[in-house]
C-alpha cells in the first residue's frame, strides 16, 4: 500500500511487482554495502503501455516525444545541457550516486548482452562530472559557473536549435549581419523565463583583422521591411580580440520573455560584427561559426524557467484528483498485486520500517532515443513494520507513537502506523522534445531519502 501511495504517485508498487523495470536488492537504511543482484522479467505489452502512460503523466508529457534522429557527432546544445544536468544532479542526490552508478553499470552489462547499442541517442553513456570555467576554449562547450548559478532558481532548462536554414551573411546598405530564429511555442504554459542566453562559437578571425578588437552585437528584430534595414533593438554586446577562441554568451532574457507572452512578435535575432572604428565586417570573417561549422560548435539558445505558484497549485490539485480516482478504480488490483509481493517476501515484511533499494529503468521502456540522461535512477522505497515499541531509528512522529499505543488496546479498530518516506529528493531528466530541442527538467519528490513511521 505504502509503495503505491507514496512512491512515484502510485505506480512504483506496480513497477516493483513487474520486476523488469526495477532492480531489487535487500538492504536497509543503515546498510553500507550495495547489493548488485537484480531480478528481471519481460513486461507484457499491456503492462509496458500502462507503465509508459503513467510515467509520462508524472513527467508532465502528453505523449512520448519522437525527436529527429541525431547525427553521428553530438551537437553543441545537448553537450552544454549535459553539463547543466551534471551540476543539477550532483546537488540533488550526492549520497545516492554510488548506488546509481552501480545499478546503471549492472543495467549496461545486461543491455550489452541483449545487443543494445553502446550509445543509443548519440551522446556519451557515462556522463563525466562537469567542470565550470568562465570561458571555455574547448569543444564541447562547458557550462560556466554563471550558468550553474541560474539552476538554483530554475525548475526547467530548455535549449533551442536555430531554425534559419540558410547559413547566409546578409548585406544591406553596406551592413553585414546574420539571422537566427528559435521556436519558443513549445514552452509549457505557466513557465516564466528567469534567464535566457544566445551562444555562438568564435574561431580565430580572418588574418586581415589580426590586431583588431571586434565588437559583436545581438539585436532583436522588431519589424522587417523589403526595401530597407529592419527595425532593431540592441540586446547585448561583446568585445573580443581577433585571435580569441571560445563561446560568446549574450543575455537575451528580456526578448525571450516578450516572445513567450507575444509569440507573434518573434521575428528572430540579428548578429552583427564591426571593427573598433565602426566598420561593419562579414560575420564569418570575424570567426563566428554558423550552420556550415562542426556540430559541436553550432549556435543555440538556452532559457531557464520557473513554474508559477498558480501552476504548481493547479498541478497538485489535478494530481490529487487523479490519484483519488485511480485508487478507487484499482484498489482491488493493487491489493492483489501487493499480496503477491508479500507472499514472495514474507520475512522482509516482519522487519522494522526502513529504506529499501529500488532502481527504475527508463531504458527498459524503450525510451533511450529521447531520454539523454539518466538511463534510470535509484528511487528507493519504504517498507517494514511499525510495531511497539517504536525506537529512535524508526523516525516515528508523536502521532505514530500515540497511534501505536491505541492500536495495542484496540487492534480491531485502530491500525498500526504506516512505514512511509519522511524525506524525498528531486531528480533531473534530460530529454529531447518533438522538435529536437533539449529540455532539462527537475521533478520533485521522486527519490526516498529516509523512512519513518506515520
From Swiss-Prot:
It holds the Pfam family TGF_beta. Residues 318-343 are annotated as: Disordered. It is found in: Secreted. Disulfide bonds join 353-419, 382-451, 386-453. Residues 31-316 form a propeptide. It comes from the Eukaryota. Belongs to the TGF-beta family. This is Bone morphogenetic protein 5. It comes from Homo sapiens. The lineage of its organism: Eukaryota, Metazoa, Chordata, Craniata, Vertebrata. The gene is BMP5.
Amino acid at each position: 500500500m505504502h509503495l503505491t501511495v507514496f512512491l512515484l504517485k502510485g505506480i512504483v508498487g506496480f513497477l516493483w511487482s513487474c520486476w523488469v523495470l526495477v532492480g531489487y536488492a535487500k538492504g536497509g537504511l543503515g546498510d553500507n554495502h550495495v547489493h548488485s543482484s537484480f531480478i528481471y522479467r519481460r513486461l507484457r505489452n499491456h503492462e509496458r503501455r500502462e507503465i509508459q502512460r503513467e510515467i509520462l503523466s508524472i513527467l508532465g508529457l502528453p505523449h512520448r516525444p519522437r525527436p529527429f534522429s541525431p547525427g553521428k557527432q553530438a551537437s553543441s546544445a545537448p553537450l552544454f545541457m549535459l553539463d547543466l544536468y551534471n551540476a543539477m544532479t550532483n546537488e540533488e542526490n550526492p549520497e545516492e550516486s554510488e548506488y546509481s552508478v552501480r545499478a546503471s553499470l549492472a543495467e549496461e552489462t545486461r543491455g550489452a548482452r541483449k545487443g543494445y547499442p553502446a550509445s543509443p541517442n548519440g551522446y556519451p553513456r557515462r556522463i563525466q562530472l562537469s567542470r565550470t570555467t568562465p570561458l571555455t576554449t574547448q569543444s564541447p562547450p562547458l557550462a560556466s559557473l554563471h550558468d550553474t548559478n541560474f539552476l538554483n532558481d530554475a525548475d526547467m532548462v530548455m535549449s533551442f536549435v536555430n531554425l534559419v536554414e540558410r547559413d547566409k551573411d546578409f548585406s544591406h546598405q553596406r551592413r553585414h549581419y546574420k539571422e537566427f530564429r528559435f521556436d519558443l511555442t513549445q514552452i509549457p504554459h505557466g513557465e516564466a523565463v528567469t534567464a535566457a542566453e544566445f551562444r555562438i562559437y568564435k574561431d580565430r578571425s580572418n588574418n586581415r583583422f589580426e590586431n583588431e578588437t571586434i565588437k559583436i552585437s545581438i539585436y532583436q528584430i522588431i519589424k522587417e521591411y523589403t526595401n530597407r534595414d529592419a527595425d532593431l533593438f540592441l540586446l547585448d554586446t561583446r568585445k573580443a580580440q581577433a585571435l580569441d577562441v571560445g563561446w560568446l554568451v549574450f543575455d537575451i532574457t528580456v526578448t525571450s520573455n516578450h516572445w513567450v507572452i507575444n509569440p507573434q512578435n518573434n521575428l528572430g535575432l540579428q548578429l552583427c560584427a564591426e571593427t573598433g572604428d565602426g566598420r561593419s565586417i562579414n560575420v564569418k570573417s570575424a570567426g563566428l561559426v554558423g550552420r556550415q561549422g562542426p556540430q559541436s560548435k553550432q549556435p543555440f539558445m538556452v532559457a531557464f524557467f520557473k513554474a508559477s505558484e498558480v501552476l504548481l497549485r493547479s498541478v497538485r490539485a489535478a494530481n490529487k484528483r487523479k490519484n483519488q480516482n485511480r485508487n478507487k478504480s484499482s484498489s482491488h488490483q493493487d491489493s492483489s498485486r501487493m499480496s503477491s509481493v508479500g507472499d514472495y517476501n514474507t520475512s522482509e515484511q516482519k522487519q522494522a520500517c526502513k529504506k529499501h533499494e529500488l532502481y527504475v529503468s527508463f531504458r527498459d521502456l524503450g525510451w533511450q532515443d529521447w531520454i539523454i540522461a539518466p538511463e534510470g535512477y535509484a528511487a528507493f522505497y519504504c517498507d517494514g513494520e511499525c510495531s511497539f515499541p517504536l525506537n529512535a531509528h524508526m523516525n516515528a512522529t508523536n502521532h505514530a507513537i500515540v497511534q501505536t499505543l491505541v492500536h495495542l488496546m484496540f487492534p480491531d479498530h485502530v491500525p498500526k502506523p504506516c512505514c512511509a518516506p519522511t524525506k524525498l529528493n528531486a531528480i533531473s531528466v534530460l530529454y529531447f522534445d518533438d522538435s529536437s530541442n533539449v529540455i532539462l527538467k527537475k521533478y520533485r519528490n521522486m527519490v526516498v531519502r529516509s523512512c519513518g513511521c506515520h
